[in-house]
Amino acid sequence: MASTDKPGGDPEYRTSSTPAPAGVDYFKFDVILRFLLFAASLVAVVVIVTANQTEVIRVPQPVPWPAKFRYSPAFVYFVAALSVTGLYSIITTLASLLASNKPALKTKLLLYFILWDALILGIIASATGTAGGVAYLGLKGNRHVVGWNKICHVYDKFCRHVGASIAVALFGSVVTVLLIWLSAYSIHSRVPK
């Protein structure tokens, strides 16, 4: 069967001698956002770890009763998750700095960043949610369950530290979402149109 194609071939399937577009280079913003993620993780961990407070509670007789982050598994998970996030942000900041000088490595690295950033976002969000749930119980209590009374009127310094740490971790979650969007947009801008 004879081909009915024109000598030039189908323009849609023709190979181009021009290279693919370089795309928009946002690696400087990527480094800044990754540094912000590190700072947010570090601040959140330091603030919650220093949230120790001891108050005298009057049960039949006065007893000193401490409140520490390590007494709640949710807060321990929060500290562990944000510590992992801080380490991850250091590693990826260094990788971004090294890749900024090597254009061939940038696109592949962006794809890996999207995948790992999404995983880290899940870790940060789950840790912030669990710590936020426990903090809310400390603030408001649960009148439907015996023994789940509010404690923030007694342990005010501890609750302020926990609340501030959760707020900073929430900022870290937003920074991670921005990192994912930035990487996705950078990859999208590199796709030939």
Curated annotation (Swiss-Prot):
User: In this UniProt entry, which residues form the Extracellular topological domain(s)?
Assistant: 52-73, 130-161
Give the positions annotated as glycosylation sites: N52
Q: Which sequence ranges are marked TM in the entry?
A: 31-51, 74-94, 109-129, 162-182
Ranges per topology, Cytoplasmic: 1-30, 95-108, 183-193
Report the family membership: Belongs to the Casparian strip membrane proteins (CASP) family.
Subunit and partners: Homodimer and heterodimers.
Which is one Gene Ontology cellular component term of this protein? Answer: plasma membrane
Q: Where in the cell is it found?
A: Cell membrane
Topology with regard to the membrane? Answer: Multi-pass membrane protein
Which Pfam families does its entry note? CASP_dom
Keyword entries, A-Z:
Cell membrane, Glycoprotein, Membrane, Transmembrane, Transmembrane helix
Which protein are we looking at?
Answer: CASP-like protein 1D2
Give the originating organism.
Glycine max (Soybean)
Question: Which NCBIfam families does its entry note?
Answer: A_tha_TIGR01569
Q: Which InterPro entries match?
A: CASP/CASPL, CASP_dom, CASPL
